[in-house]
Regions:
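Hydrophobic alpha-helical segments of multi-pass membrane transport proteins
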Residues: 133, 202-206, 345-346, 394-417
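Transmembrane helix-loop boundary segments of multi-pass membrane transporters
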Residues: 51-57, 61, 112, 123-130, ...
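Select transmembrane alpha-helical segments in multipass membrane proteins
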Residues: 25-36, 101-114, 169-173, 231-245, ...
Length: 417
């Protein structure tokens, strides 16, 4: 039994099994880079920037983003090297199966499933909140009973009833994203690239117009003096802020799950991973620099620091609605990439079994938790159908877990790495 648990699959067999699959190689470096940017840039650029600057790093938050970006780049290099050697879907699940054995692969595979599950479900809740705010800007009010979860997690009380019926916007966006993914990877990639272009354009718009209202006085001192407590300003604050804004980089590993659909995975996947990290780091640094320059950093201690910065300069209030649109677009692409990546984890266990893998822990469906139908390919579209249709079922619980899902997803990502 121990021998089976530690058994590995030769790289040649993994590659051969992947080549015999029905997935088409249609994604180039630009599409893969867009996948990475789509997965990484969500609300982190609009939320974490202000909180980390106000409470930890001050204007030096730009250094925190650079430090976090460099750390992610090292992890990205590992993913890039593995993706070049083992150009199949499955990401860390397939890599660990080739190197560490079936049991470790099974453990990492389910951690990836949890990462994408809680990530997409939590982001759907956040998407709902931004859509409600956007509708309110046009004087359209959605009843609270249809925009909140019937259950919430209260500290010290566990699950409590909220009196709401269901989070209708969250359910609808999951259904829409599922439909896009079932249509096919080419269509999904096109929609993702379009959404990424919209949200990046809005971020650049805020940076460009906000730069005219930057005051160098707000950047002095660049690294505020430490308050006497570790992590509150000073260099310790810069490092602590780097750990906080690390959450804003989660998702770049999703690029590796599309290796089996890359035209030239040995070249395109590394470009997609590292290219997306460079673009995201650049946008994060510029946005944080502009925000801390527009007003004193203590005033950014708000869950919506961009809105606070815009309100401090009435001439920029017209950017409020574009920022909401950018947040909605950002979260939409995050959901799309997360759900696409999870289907790849489900699908890889299916074709590994078809390639002759022993029936044991390496097949997630053999664990008795994942149904054998999950991961089945719809041959006319080369996409996983059952893995996508399980997502609305997961969301039927309607538990409002937006804040908790960030920590669950981060923990799963670190364990899988």
């Amino acid at each position: 039994m121990l021998k089976n648990l530690l058994a590995t699959k030769p790289v040649q067999d993994l590659t051969a099994a992947g080549e015999s699959n029905d997935l088409r190689r249609t994604l180039g470096p630009a599409a893969l880079t867009a996948l990475g940017v789509g997965a990484v840039i969500g609300t982190g650029i609009f939320v974490l920037t202000g909180l980390a600057a106000a409470n930890n790093a001050g204007p030096a938050i730009v250094l925190s983003f650079v430090i976090a970006g460099v750390g992610c780049a090292f992890a990205g290099l590992c993913y890039a090297e593995f993706a070049a050697m083992i150009p199949v879907s499955g990401s860390a699940y397939a890599y660990s199966y080739a190197t560490l054995g079936e049991f470790i692969a099974w453990f990492i595979g389910w951690n990836l499933v949890l990462e994408y599950l809680f990530g997409a479900a939590g982001v759907a809740v956040g998407w709902s909140r931004y859509v409600v705010k956007l509708l309110e800007a046009f004087h359209i009010n959605l009843p609270p009973a249809l925009s909140n979860a019937p259950l919430d997690i209260a500290p010290g009380h566990g699950l409590v009833q909220t009196g709401a019926m269901l989070n209708l916007p969250a359910v609808l966006i999951i259904a829409v994203v599922t439909s896009i993914l079932v249509a096919g990877v080419r269509q999904s990639s096109f929609v993702n690239s379009l959404i990424v272009a919209i949200k990046v354009a809005i971020v650049v718009l805020v940076i460009a117009f906000g730069a005219f209202y930057v005051s160098a006085d707000n950047w002095r001192p660049f690294i505020p003096e430490n308050s006497g407590e570790w992590g509150v300003y000073g260099w310790s604050g810069v490092l602590r802020a780097a750990g906080i804004v690390f959450f804003a980089y989660l998702g770049f590993d999703a690029v590796s799950t599309a290796a089996q659909e890359a035209k030239n995975p040995q070249r395109d996947v590394p470009i997609g991973i590292l290219g997306s990290l460079v673009i995201c780091t650049l946008l994060y640094v510029l946005m944080s620099g502009v925000l801390t320059g527009m007003l004193p950093y203590p005033r950014l201690n708000d869950a919506a620091p961009v809105a606070v910065a815009l309100e401090a300069h009435p001439e920029l209030l017209w950017l409020t609605i574009p920022v909401l649109i950018g947040a909605v677009a950002g979260l939409t692409s995050v959901m799309l990439v997360m759900m696409m990546a999870q289907s790849r984890i489900f699908n890889v266990s299916r074709w590994l079994a078809a390639a002759g893998v022993p029936r044991n822990a390496s097949r997630m469906e053999d664990a008795g938790v994942l149904d054998r139908a999950d991961g089945r390919l719809r041959r006319d579209h080369r996409r996983s159908v059952s893995a996508h249709t399980t997502r609305p079922a997961c969301l039927d619980r309607h538990v409002d877990c937006f804040h908790h899902s960030l920590h669950w997803r981060a923990g799963a990502a670190l364990r899988s790495a």
